[in-house]
Amino acid sequence: MSGRIPNHGYMQPASISATSCGHDYQFPTLANSESDLLEEDAEEFELRPRGKEKTRRSTSKERIDDIVYISRDICEGDTLNSIALQYCCTVADLKRANNFLNEQDFFALRTIKIPVKRFSVLTQPHFSPKAKATRPGTLQLSPEHQESDLLIGPSSYETAGSFLQEVDRDIEKIVKSTDTKKESLNEVVSALSQEHFEPEQILVPQRDPYHGADWSLGWWTAVAIMVFVGIITPLFYFLYYEVLMKVNTSHTLNSIEKSGPS
């Protein structure tokens, strides 16, 4: 493993010889020990992701599995940005799918691979009227998807047609086996015209809306009383007071005039 420091233990000398300068110690060769260390260093251990890193890797793997590539013919006026906006992907995804080093490599191709989700609307073959008129089949699925469509399409149509034919035969059998005589029709009419038993409806006594502190008076009665007390009574009192005062004043003036000096 990288970054590992070799650990050498104490090794005894193989031979000791005396020299003029001192003692000469000879040790055995370290070739075997170095090869052992290299073998130990060559061992690799698999590190398993845990926690958020594990979920991140699993989600990224699922995303890669869900992506399929469709091929599209490049028309005049197409750019990487327009295709990315049209198919809801990024320019980086288009560059990665087509191995573009820069955006100028796009103009050297006639077809482009577009990454889309496996079960999306974009994987269905649909063409615009303009594209049909200029270049039919501008949007194509991969050969594997085309073969699967060819294998599944006609068989599904045949099964649907056979199912409808069986339904028609069952309807014809039911119509033929049904008795359309007058007697059976009369029985049906009599059965429908019979009086069915209806459960007796329980009458719930209605609550008196005028029961309470209003002396069982309706709102219109209360309004009439308020109008009479608040408007009509003061009006009669005012008119009576004015007429009475005028009569008293005229009577006083007449008496003064009669009793005055002659």
Swiss-Prot record:
Keyword entries, A-Z: Cell membrane, Golgi apparatus, Membrane, Transmembrane, Transmembrane helix
Protein name: LysM and putative peptidoglycan-binding domain-containing protein 3
Gene3D superfamilies: LysM domain
Membrane association type: Single-pass membrane protein
Organism: Xenopus tropicalis (Western clawed frog)
SMART domains given in the database record: LysM
InterPro entries to which the protein is assigned, alphabetical: LYSM1-4 (IPR045030), LysM_dom (IPR018392), LysM_dom_sf (IPR036779)
Cytoplasmic compartment residues: 240-262
Pfam families for this protein: LysM
